[in-house]
Amino acid sequence: MLGMKLVRLIEKHSEALSRELMEQVLNSEHASDFQKIPQEDLRLAATDLYRNLEEWLLQKREDDIAERFKAVAARRVQEGIRPHHMMWALMLTRDCLWRYLRKEAFLDSIVELHAELELQQLLNQFFDRAIYYAIQGYEEAEEQRRRRTDWTRAQELAVSIGLLSPPRAHHETAEETS
């Protein structure tokens, strides 16, 4: 693939790219929830994505992308990151790549232009799927949270009307259990 030269350029400079991305995310009012997360965690997540970009674009299947971004979304829910902030951060991740490539890649021929367009298509496809599955992950995490809340309310109601006994304390003595 012609665009692999550009992908390798991104992977080679993954540390610098991740620092730039982290600064953009932390300074964006549209992604301000990410200020709740340790900066080192954000930097490592971005570096991992950029460093393994070729694998994500060429070797990973759609199921792999779904699994990864649903898990990321579930983790972000636990961290208090709202969905629209996560989506903005993903868009910043993609945009950071393109700014870098425009700055660093010197297109000397129509072949290199074709390679960049080919890479752009792959990246857009990847990030579209990442956003889709991240949203799905948020929805699944919210549904699980809602079910746990509903179950807790149902148990409390059953106890209050005498259908269930109140839960026992976890620290029972030997006399109480015999």
Model-derived regions: residue spans:
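Short, low-complexity, intrinsically disordered N-terminal peptides in bacterial proteins
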Residues: 1-2, 177
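N-terminal low-complexity or simple alpha-helical regulatory segments
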Residues: 2-84
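Long, amphipathic alpha-helical coupling/dimerization segments that relay conformational signals between
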Residues: 6, 65-172, 176
